[in-house]
Amino acid sequence: MKIVVSRGLDLSLKGAPKESGFCGKVDPTYVSVDLRPFAPLPLEVKVTPGDQVTAGSPLAEYKLFSGVFITSPVDGEVVEIRRGNKRALLEIVIKKKPGISQTKFSYDLQSLTQKDLLEVFKKEGLFALFKQRPFDIPALPTQSPRDVFINLADNRPFTPSVEKHLSLFSSKEDGYYIFVVGVQAIAKLFGLKPHIISTDRLTLPTQDLVSIAHLHTIDGPFPSGSPSTHIHHIARIRNERDVVFTISFQEVLSIGHLFLKGFVLGQQIVALAGSALPPSQRKYLITAKGASFSDLLPKDIFSSDEITLISGDPLTGRLCKKEENPCLGMRDHTITLLPNPKTRESFSFLRLGWNKLTVTRTYLSGFFKRKRVFMDMDTNMHGEKRPIIDAEIYERVSAIPVPVALIIKALETQNFEEACRLGLLEVAPEDFALPTFIDPSKTEMFSIVKESLLRYAKENVVTSS
């Protein structure tokens, strides 16, 4: 199936590393296992500071679903268990042993029954890789998904491409074969043909995939790479019982690597990007999953007060505090560095804005059709919070036809029934990142949706499963 998306916005941000750039290798001293994505689920920590762990060792377990573990990506020693407000679990920090783990696993995918395969996924931390829709929560083992969507079309700013992720392996063919094994495992686990969404520029091993998966391509501006866009065009979610699972290309590689090679895939590709980073430092690295920022960035840049650190891309990433020695998030493959200006731009309201991004023709650049305008992004808000006036501008950049402003208003009044009627079941917080970015009212739509979905999932979805 060929999907063409017309709505959205092509973001050309300054600071992207060169796609042809060489991938250097960094073996970090510290890594962390990010537990924030599991916020709707109560977790039981299985380790204490001082414990020795190996790649694949259980670090935490789902309290409500016994036997589902979150595991360590590396060998090392647990040094800290970080908690936030109300003792909420944030991450488990590990002092990594040098080198790659040699802990060997032996699973024969062909001989495993579906029931045995599920136990392997739960035990080895593979089930924790899936996300569940609606409500964008960690996948629950009590649910049987209607469909599984595998995303190979992620086009968030600065996110490494599929080709870059294949740099982890000796050859592109080797990487694709590992991916095929991962797809085979998913198809057998759930007894269905998963949907694989890629772009036209990718050359997939279709002869190996066509019998075990549905293949689709998508074309269009950001956010055409969003799983919500794929689900909407291929098989829409129409009610709360319409459960689907989503998973990324990199996570399928982790599944295939365990079954084919017998080792935990503890490495990942990371992009160092952002306009605050000198061009010579913008690059791709091969490093451990959850690596600490201080091991990947030059000391003078990491400690600078004029730079904002983000784990992930600039639109959906997590703001990090330097004093907490931040590490990469669970699903993050980018470290973004943005300038943090201390003063506002003088007479900004009088400037023509030839190189400023606008979707409302506030600046001169909005009246000229140029193929690409490279925007120099920083953390300046360029104004204060205002009431929502023009609700139509959000629909211009939303790839899914949902009334963005009405959903936000329903969520702010905690009217979930109305929000679901308007289309909340089809979306995730990341789908509101672009409307938040272009919003003249400065409303934090991304945060509103994220917190509302978390609250609703805790009270209604997780406890009833």
UniProtKB/Swiss-Prot annotation:
Any GO BP annotation: sodium ion transport
Coiled coil: none
Record key words, sorted: Ion transport, NAD, Sodium, Sodium transport, Translocase, Transport, Ubiquinone
An annotated Gene Ontology molecular function: oxidoreductase activity, acting on NAD(P)H, quinone or similar compound as acceptor
Enzyme class: translocase
Catalyzed chemical reaction(s): a ubiquinone + n Na(+)(in) + NADH + H(+) = a ubiquinol + n Na(+)(out) + NAD(+)
Pfam families registered for this protein in UniProt: NQRA_2nd, NQRA_N, NQRA_SLBB
EC numbers: 7.2.1.1
Record bears the keyword NAD: yes
Family recorded in the similarity comment: Belongs to the NqrA family.
Task performed by this protein: NQR complex catalyzes the reduction of ubiquinone-1 to ubiquinol by two successive reactions, coupled with the transport of Na(+) ions from the cytoplasm to the periplasm. NqrA to NqrE are probably involved in the second step, the conversion of ubisemiquinone to ubiquinol.
HAMAP family: NqrA
UniProt xrefs under PANTHER family: NA(+)-TRANSLOCATING NADH-QUINONE REDUCTASE SUBUNIT A
Subunit note: Composed of six subunits; NqrA, NqrB, NqrC, NqrD, NqrE and NqrF.
Protein name, entry field: Na(+)-translocating NADH-quinone reductase subunit A
Gene source species: Chlamydia trachomatis serovar L2 (strain ATCC VR-902B / DSM 19102 / 434/Bu)
Gene behind this protein: nqrA
